[in-house]
């Protein structure tokens, strides 16, 4: 039995898709366990760039099973768009499996997400407005509609009628907005369900059978630890658990079956949306990192906020996700910067903090304590081993591993999967 979890250690956009794609080569099953189409990942496969939001990165390998787990929330309309996107490019999706227990995002979730953000004004969370939060709210309130319901004409109609009676009252009374017609949503989305029915099954059985047979299973996290609803910078977080512990809940696989956890981070930090960001850069270096690193959201297109590498954040991720291995991406983006900095602690009211404070008012006032290292000017995009890196770049990578306390397993010097280099094999093969 060999299972590996890939999680983001920052605020998402760390390059998890590329690392998952890279690790997929030796995996036999690839599964997502939380989130929805609010997560965007860019994958370069055979020289072609693909942008996915729902479907696991392993979809490009026909012989590998790809799983959308029960912990995800699925917009059937968005899923069908993504399936067509792949089919139009000659990519088969016969290897896709969708949990019959995954919850469904419906039009009223999208509308509620948008209206609530507008209502909050300056206090908005900065959601992607994909209906993720409202769908998870309904799940917690036990009124959600699952894939199994979507495929059952009678059950879907009954639950939709009940939910819309409440949702339409909410739209009219709280937001002064029009509600939805039950029949229109029912006919449209029941048809969507029929189009994806071939993929729907009990994915917990699929995953556990694979593990019991000794097959290699890769679990692909979305977003990042700092966006985790429990361990992140709450309330500026997503509505699910990207931490490694989310695998057991979101896939139906027991914790004893998780063997390795790879934490993915960039050589700097980025963030989309609102919330505290201690190492954020507002100067020319920040702009340089944004442009060279192409720091614009895959899902939203919004410019990402960027800053220096924060070892306090990644140490937090190591602790709450039990990270066993580190994957450091985008080292090449820092090339040409004379002095590079790593945040080693925070300072608040004269006190040095080694951990991320839960109180966001405190976090917002924290000043980063930096360690400065000499930069490098050499082109490193063709480097194939740690030893080939220029001395200053190699020292930077080693220092990140030391400060975070996570052994380095791989590092990347560019966006293509061929620019990802293995230091040690996470599958133990």
UniProtKB/Swiss-Prot annotation:
GO biological process: one example: IMP metabolic process
Per UniProt, substrate binds at 298-304
Cellular component aspect of the GO annotation: cytoplasm
Which residues of this UniProt protein bind Mg(2+)? Answer: 13, 40
The residues the record assigns to binding IMP are 13-16, 38-41, 128, 142, 223, 238, 302
CDD domains linked to this entry: AdSS (cd03108)
Write out the pathway annotation from the protein's UniProt entry.
Purine metabolism; AMP biosynthesis via de novo pathway; AMP from IMP: step 1/2
- Which keywords does this chain's UniProt record carry? Cytoplasm, GTP-binding, Ligase, Magnesium, Metal-binding, Nucleotide-binding, Purine biosynthesis
Chief localization class? Answer: cytoplasm
Q: Where does GTP bind?
A: 12-18, 40-42, 304, 330-332, 412-414
Compartments annotated for it: namely: Cytoplasm
> Quick check: keyword Acetylation in the entry?
no
Q: Which HAMAP family match?
A: Adenylosucc_synth
Q: What is this protein called?
A: Adenylosuccinate synthetase
Q: Which organism is it from?
A: Bacillus cytotoxicus (strain DSM 22905 / CIP 110041 / 391-98 / NVH 391-98)
């Amino acid at each position: 039995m060999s299972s590996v979890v890939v999680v983001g250690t920052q605020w998402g956009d760390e390059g998890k898709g590329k690392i998952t794609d890279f690790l997929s080569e030796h995996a036999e099953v690839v599964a997502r366990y939380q989130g929805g189409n609010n997560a965007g990942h860019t994958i370069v496969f055979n020289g072609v760039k693909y942008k996915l939001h729902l479907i696991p990165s392993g979809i490009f390998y026909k012989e590998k099973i790809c799983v959308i787990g029960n912990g995800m929330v699925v917009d059937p309309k968005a899923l069908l768009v993504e399936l067509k996107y792949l089919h139009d490019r000659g990519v088969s999706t016969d290897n896709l499996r969708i949990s019959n227990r995954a919850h469904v995002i419906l039009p009223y979730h999208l509308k509620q997400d948008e209206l609530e953000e507008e209502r909050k004004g300056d206090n908005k969370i900065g959601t992607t407005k994909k209906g993720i939060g409202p769908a998870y709210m309904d799940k917690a309130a036990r009124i959600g509609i699952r894939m199994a319901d979507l495929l059952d004409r009678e059950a879907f109609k009954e639950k939709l009628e009940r939910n819309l009676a409440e949702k339409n009252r909410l739209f009219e009374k709280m937001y002064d907005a029009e509600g939805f017609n039950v029949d229109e949503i029912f006919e449209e989305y029941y048809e969507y369900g029929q189009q994806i029915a071939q993929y729907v099954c009990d994915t917990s059985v699929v995953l556990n059978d694979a593990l019991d047979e000794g097959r290699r299973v890769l679990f692909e996290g979305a977003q990042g630890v700092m966006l985790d609803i429990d361990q992140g910078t709450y309330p500026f977080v997503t509505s699910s658990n990207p931490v490694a512990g989310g695998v057991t809940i979101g896939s139906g696989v027991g914790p004893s079956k998780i063997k390795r956890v790879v934490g993915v981070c960039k050589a700097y930090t980025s963030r989309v949306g609102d919330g505290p960001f201690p190492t954020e850069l507002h100067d020319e270096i920040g702009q340089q990192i944004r442009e060279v690193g192409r720091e614009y959201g895959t899902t939203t297109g919004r410019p990402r906020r960027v800053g220096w590498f924060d070892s306090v954040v990644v140490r937090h991720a190591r602790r709450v996700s039990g990270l066993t291995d580190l994957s450091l991406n985008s080292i090449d983006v820092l090339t040409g910067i004379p002095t590079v900095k790593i945040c080693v602690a925070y300072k608040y009211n004269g006190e040095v903090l080694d951990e991320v404070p839960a109180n966001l008012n405190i976090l917002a006032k924290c000043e980063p304590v930096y360690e400065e290292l000499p930069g490098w000017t050499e082109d490193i995009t063709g480097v194939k081993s740690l030893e080939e890196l220029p001395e200053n770049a190699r020292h930077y990578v080693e220092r990140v591993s030391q400060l975070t306390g996570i052994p380095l397993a791989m590092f990347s010097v560019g966006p293509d999967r061929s620019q990802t280099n293995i230091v040690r094999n996470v599958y133990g093969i």
